């Protein structure tokens, strides 16, 4: 089926006039998928589904105290100062009150963020950064106090002071779109349970296959699988389907693209959900990885790699998990694409400062049996982000959306419906009460 659709796309391309500008918009397939050409010759399969168009809702009633109060719902003030020091440390100061009230039943995350958070930026050589709540002068290190004070010269300071309206995203609302982005080796099929669930609730959903994955085209050039190339693909898909309030849901490597889009389009991204995405560190490929072996060697090792993924990606390794792995097209890519994807994970901008600048509310979901992403990394992400909630799933692993679909669907839906209480600084002065009529 894919070959026929792709051939049709290329025939259309060859049949266009020489002076045609811009790529082909899209081709609809008979099985409900859309093939979008994000660049000439670069075609992504996209699952775009939603409820049938309904009649326009009646206009809201005019003067109403409830409507006036509704205009203030979800309005919060985001205030934060980020200071980067020359000695490689980062100080994050939360100047306002972040809406960290209980989000979910059995919430695992902490209640209130620390007033200040001091971070040692991750060393590109591989040393892990450490988090230490405290003031600018806290922390112990080698050297005398004078040397420490001289080393703590600010390199740059970033001030964040804005108001955001964080509202409940319901399925019946036409301005809400959910974007699902998978990780390395997956496809949009890993989101089947989530896509079906949210479409039944009336949400509009968009789920692309990354290049080289699923039914998308697979260029035989390693440069086609760098982070920046894939991020531009996701930008094109986002700009095509985005509406007023967009929610990004990413898994593993897909979380990095969600972060990128949230940073690029802060006014369009309403909420973000990160599933087993790891810590807030810049991406850099490992030169000692097994994926740096020649493609022919990786091809011979593919059965072993698939078995290793089953062992590390699922809490259990029974017949059910093997079937989920097969049906979800997880870890089902060519050796060339797998090698190029792993070696192309270079994103130096995506460090702690980049994540600390985000003002969008984030739900972090972590499967406790995950052997790819330690829970400490997601905990570190929750501490860096301004508005973050961490939820741990005891029965899940790296592929938690396949293992525990009901639990994941419930968490995601509750987060979509969540709406914070407005902070005092975001509220206007109350209007004076009208004088009472004297009888």
From Swiss-Prot:
Biased composition (Basic residues): 146-156
Region (Disordered): 49-70, 124-156
One Pfam family it belongs to: Abhydrolase_1
Protein family per UniProt: Belongs to the AB hydrolase superfamily.
Class of enzymatic activity (EC top level): hydrolase
Any Gene Ontology CC annotation: extracellular exosome
GO biological process: lipid homeostasis; negative regulation of NLRP3 inflammasome complex assembly; phosphatidic acid biosynthetic process
Domain of life: Eukaryota
Molecular function in Gene Ontology: carboxylic ester hydrolase activity; lysophosphatidic acid acyltransferase activity
Subcellular localization, as worded in the UniProt entry: Cytoplasm
Domain AB hydrolase-1: 177-279
Alphabetized UniProt keyword annotations: Cytoplasm, Hydrolase, Inflammatory response
Function field: Negatively regulates NLRP3-driven inflammation. Promotes NLRP3 degradation through the chaperone-mediated autophagy (CMA) pathway, hence attenuating inflammasome activation and IL1B secretion. Acts by recruiting palmitoyltransferase ZDHHC12 to NLRP3, facilitating NLRP3 palmitoylation and subsequent degradation.
Gene: ABHD8
Organism of this sequence: Homo sapiens (Human)
Enzyme nomenclature, EC number: 3.-.-.-
Subunit structure: Interacts with NLRP3 (via NACHT and LLR domains); this interaction is enhanced in the presence of NLRP3 inflammasome inducers, such as ATP, nigericin, silica, or alum. Interacts with ZDHHC12. (Microbial infection) Interacts with SARS-CoV-2 nucleoprotein N; this interaction disrupts the NLRP3-ABHD8 association, enhancing NLRP3 stability, ultimately leading to increased inflammasome activation.
SUPFAM superfamilies: alpha/beta-Hydrolases
Active site: 252 (charge relay system), 370 (charge relay system), 398 (charge relay system)
UniProt-recorded name of the protein: Protein ABHD8
Annotated Gly residues bias: 136-145
């Amino acid at each position: 089926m894919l070959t026929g659709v792709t051939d049709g796309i290329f025939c259309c391309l060859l049949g266009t006039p020489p002076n045609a500008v811009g790529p082909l918009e899209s081709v609809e397939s008979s099985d409900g998928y859309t093939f979008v050409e994000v660049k000439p010759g670069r075609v992504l399969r996209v699952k775009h589904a939603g409820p049938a168009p309904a009649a326009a809702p009646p206009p809201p009633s005019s003067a109403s105290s409830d409507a006036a109060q509704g205009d203030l719902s979800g309005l919060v003030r985001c205030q934060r100062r980020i200071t980067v020091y020359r000695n490689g440390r980062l100080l994050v100061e939360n100047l306002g009150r972040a809406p960290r009230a209980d989000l979910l039943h059995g919430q695992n995350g902490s209640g209130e963020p620390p007033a200040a958070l001091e971070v040692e930026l991750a060393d590109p050589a591989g040393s892990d950064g450490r988090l230490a709540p405290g003031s600018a002068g806290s922390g112990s290190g080698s050297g005398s106090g004078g040397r420490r004070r001289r080393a703590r010269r600010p390199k740059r300071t970033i001030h964040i002071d804005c108001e955001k309206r964080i509202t409940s995203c319901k399925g019946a609302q036409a301005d809400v779109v959910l974007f699902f982005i998978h990780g390395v080796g997956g496809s949009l099929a890993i989101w089947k349970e989530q896509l079906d669930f949210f479409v039944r609730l009336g949400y509009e959903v968009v789920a692309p296959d990354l290049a080289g994955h699923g039914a998308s085209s697979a260029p035989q050039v390693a440069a086609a699988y760098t982070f920046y190339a894939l991020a531009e693909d996701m930008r094109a898909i986002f700009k095509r389907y985005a509406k007023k309030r967009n929610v990004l849901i990413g898994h593993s490597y897909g979380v990095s693209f969600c972060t990128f889009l949230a940073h690029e389009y802060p006014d369009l991204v309403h909420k973000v959900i990160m599933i087993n995405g790891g810590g807030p560190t810049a991406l850099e490929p490992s030169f000692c990885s097994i994926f740096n072996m020649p493609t022919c060697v990786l091809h011979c090792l593919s059965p072993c790699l698939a078995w290793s993924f089953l062992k590390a990606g699922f809490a259990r390794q029974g017949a059910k998990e093997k079937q989920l792995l097969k049906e979800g097209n997880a870890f089902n890519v060519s050796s060339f694409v797998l090698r190029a994807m792993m070696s192309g994970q270079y994103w130096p901008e995506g460090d702690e400062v980049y994540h600390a600048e985000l003002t969008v509310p984030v739900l972090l979901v972590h499967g406790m049996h995950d052997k790819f992403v330690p829970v400490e990394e997601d905990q570190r992400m929750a501490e860096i982000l301004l508005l973050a909630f961490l939820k741990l799933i005891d029965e899940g692993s790296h592929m938690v959306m396949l293992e525990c679909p009901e639990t994941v669907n419930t968490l995601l839906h509750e987060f979509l419906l969540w709406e914070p209480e407005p902070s005092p600084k975001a509220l206007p002065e109350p209007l004076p009460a009208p004088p009472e009529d004297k009888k």
